[in-house]
């Protein structure tokens, strides 16, 4: 005889939300939404119920923006949003630049000229199971041959190590693995002679000859902050097209 199906325990009601927090309950995370509610509602803009129904009604559906899936928009506003999406305007402005050449860094080479990403995906979906397995084996062999020529190099300088120790008791908005990666990037830069040892930069160089750092795709600026704190570099230029929260002040 088979086992009787296990009885599921009735789910307990969610606790009351903390003050000043959206009332929407996230069952997978077992907590309320961390956003601030709108002045006229108990919910934030992402979880606002339909104005035509009560608070217990289903929420309006959010869908990814087709221009940039990193943000979402209400489904009923999608058509209007696409026409005025700021990222669409940014992409159009970038394409209008005289130096812009679409896909120039995509690594097309001799065999991939003129083939779009969508066409490549379509070809992969048409593969049989055996063809897909053979393709995966080729990729594994190519990776193994390339990986043999690479070596791990995890270097952390004394200046960066002291900096990280001083951050232990601070509430920093980034994870430990990220700061160790950035410390190793700086350590390898010093090993290759791209940086002078901590403290020597500010002492040996005058104001006119002071080094400068330009970081493209700087994100929130954590890597450059470590450079500024550990190496006394004051001339920093951060380039980032996206608008991030929790950006550091250097």
Swiss-Prot record:
Induction: Induced by salt stress and abscisic acid treatment. Residues 11-20 have a biased composition (Pro residues). One of its GO terms (molecular function) is tRNA 2'-O-methyltransferase activity. Its main location: nucleus. It catalyses: cytidine(4) in tRNA(Pro) + S-adenosyl-L-methionine = 2'-O-methylcytidine(4) in tRNA(Pro) + S-adenosyl-L-homocysteine + H(+); cytidine(4) in tRNA(Gly)(GCC) + S-adenosyl-L-methionine = 2'-O-methylcytidine(4) in tRNA(Gly)(GCC) + S-adenosyl-L-homocysteine + H(+); adenosine(4) in tRNA(His) + S-adenosyl-L-methionine = 2'-O-methyladenosine(4) in tRNA(His) + S-adenosyl-L-homocysteine + H(+). The keyword Hydrolase does not apply. Its EC number is 2.1.1.225. GO terms for biological process: response to salt stress; tRNA methylation. This is tRNA:m(4)X modification enzyme TRM13. It comes from Oryza sativa subsp. japonica (Rice).
